[in-house]
Amino acid sequence: MPISKLKPVSNLRPVNKLRKSYLLISAAMLATAAGNAYAQSTEPAPSSSSEARAIEVIQVTATKRVTTIRETPLAVTAFDQNALDDNHVLQLDDLQGTVPSLHIAQNGSQNTPMVYLRGIGSSDQTESGDPAVAFHVDGVYSARSQGASALMFDLEGAEILRGPQGTLFGRNATGGVVNLHTAKPNLDYFEANAEFTLGNYDRRATRAMVNLPLTDTLAIRVAAAVDKSDGVVDMAPGSAMGKKYGSTDLAAARFSALWQPNDNFDWFLSYENFIDQGTGHIPTVSGGSDRSAYIQEPGFNDFVIDSLRTRLNYNFDNGITVSYIGGYTDSSRESVWDRSWDENKYEWGGCVECDHEATQHELQLKNEDSARLQWMVGMFYFKENNSTIFDIVHPDVDYEGGSTPNPNLWSTYRQPDRGLKSNSIYAQSTYKLTDVFRISLGLRYTEDERWDRGGRNIMCPDVKRTENLPLNSDYVGLLDPDNLLNGLAPNKFLVQPGQCWVDTYNDTSPSWDKTTGMARLEWDFSPTVMLYSSYATGFKSGTIQDGGRYTGTGPFTQADLDAIIAGNNNDAAGTSAYVAPEENTSIELGLKGSFLDNTLQLFAALFTTEYTDLQVTSNVTTETGADLLRKTNAGKATINGLEVEAKWLVGSNGELNGTLSYLDAKYDEFLTTDSSYGADGIAFNPSAGNPNLPNLLDFSGNHLVQAPEFSMSLSYEHFFELSNGATVRPRLRASYSSEIWFDPANRGDRPEGFRDLPYAADIDRQDAYTKLDASLAYQPSAGNWSLEAFVNNLTDKAIKSDQGRWNSNPVPNYMWQSPRTFGVRVKVSFE
């Protein structure tokens, strides 16, 4: 079967238990909505002026079959390339405000979007953590969140699936899935286009594409994009000179080919190169300017991703299709990032060598879409390897100790071989009970293996930022008879003058397995209205963290290393260097309808999701008696919500789009330390001081981060035809969000006593805000070009994106969304 052209995608898959009262309320609401929908669908036909208009049919692959978005029984938002252009989407974080329950924050040092769907995401962007929203391009999974920073250009469609997707998409999709489908070569005709954008902050962007049929069976497509702009964070007086933080310097190119020798077989192959040389994002300290910071170390980033993706389909005469989806990704990063933003303290860190390699193989077998019993089975294999050298140069005095010298002037985190191997099998089927009822069942079994071989956290008394620690023969001998440490001291207590030592030994090799599943019932209430209910489970893989220490006073031998590794793998003893997986269960009720002769489209979803073994950070005591913050499975959370999407073709020339999201997302159980402010944060948490919880805080009942209770958007565009036949199209979009929390502590407006800083109000919260975007497009009556002027964040609203607190510095600071940006864009096409 030939590769189908896609437009958007869909999603869905929740997990665990649901409260009866919530189900009853949800069912009643959906029944009422369905009754109203049926009444609307039987109203008299609209006037002839609107009869000629209809909402475009969009196809998605959220079920790994091609279906229309209205017929897809999942909560999914989909865009084609034109819709992405209208919303000025070039990167994933540009989608914020257009998708229900989607919120995106920026991570400074990694220059990586942190994606949250329905209140679920991850702020850990390192090789030790996994995202909770899976990212796929042409069916190939990206394990590292950095892959989501790639440019979104020349696409057939972008699909955002909300809710756990544990059956068809597997691991690390507890929050949802983002599917990108690149534009495939077209065998039928030549086409080309180009786009040029100029804007403030010296914005210069170009995108271009050429599609070339070489024969009746072979076509190639070449696409490229470049996007550059100056930074948005000004250097405070006295800062080091260099590129401003917040600058953009992105480039990408893609070559793809499609070979279809007959109606039974097609082969798609693409190679993509992505380069990011922007400076990354940096927090600014509250009490000063939102857009300035004192910089001692200008940002530097050199991030390169090379990706190879392929898909082969063969259609047998009996209607069965076998598909192979393969992918290979190789990425490397070097970076430098200022970590202090303070003229009195000097600290920076970054990747000296951070390399990542991933391979995917997937084999899929399914029958034809028209069968009464549709079935699909598949096998999935994924492997990734990470090699990391990450250095931090610390200040010469302790933050909390005033003039106390800091003995750890330099630390380096060496993970020469940290990786993952995942194998899974899955099956899903849909049976047509009657002409209007369908039932679907699915299962997936996953085995995950992780490892860290030779990982070490190393501390040094003076700055030695080198890629390889030199061997010092003076330190090899009595303390290291087996030559395991290459001249390092085995711990801080045995260090000699000028010698570096191993702080933690991170070797570990945990493994897990999990079966996830789904069940769904669909009902075609009328020819244009579908109702569905679903139950689904999700699974997020366990993660590796820092391991144990050597506490001995004698020679460090292989037996000592073996004992540490045994402790790192001993979950029962509480000394493991890993965190077990988290799981969720979701129940969802949905409505998808088309009304008023397909000029009004309404989608709605009611859901509840319960999390167990939520991966959180807690306080533990090491074997040396020191208190450390470590990840652990110590939490539960429940998320109840409602999402609505609507599109209405108003009259003969207008279009109204809207989204609405309500989230009741709270921690049910969450005992932890204050991971952001330590002792300084105690005064701001009402749960502190509980005698039953010494050294712990109880965040149970607090709101999840990046999960506003209410968020909505509304956009309207109108087409005006001029006397010369040209078209002018103004467009206005408003997006609203209620308050957003950035820390589980939910401190909010508690400035008193916070190091006597009166501007510490809302230290972990963004108040409710409204953001406006506008554009005006011109299309001539004849010709192959168009012109558009646009402005985003029209009122230049200062909107916090995340809390950017680091290194025990008790001054609150924040990441920010983009300030007001504006520009013009010209598009030219050729056929």
Regions found by a protein language model. Give the residues of each.
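N-terminal Sec signal peptide and the immediately downstream disordered periplasmic leader
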Residues: M1-N87, D93-T98, N211, D263, ...
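Solvent-exposed loop segments that connect transmembrane elements
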Residues: V232-G246, T279-Q296, D338-C351, D391-Q415, ...
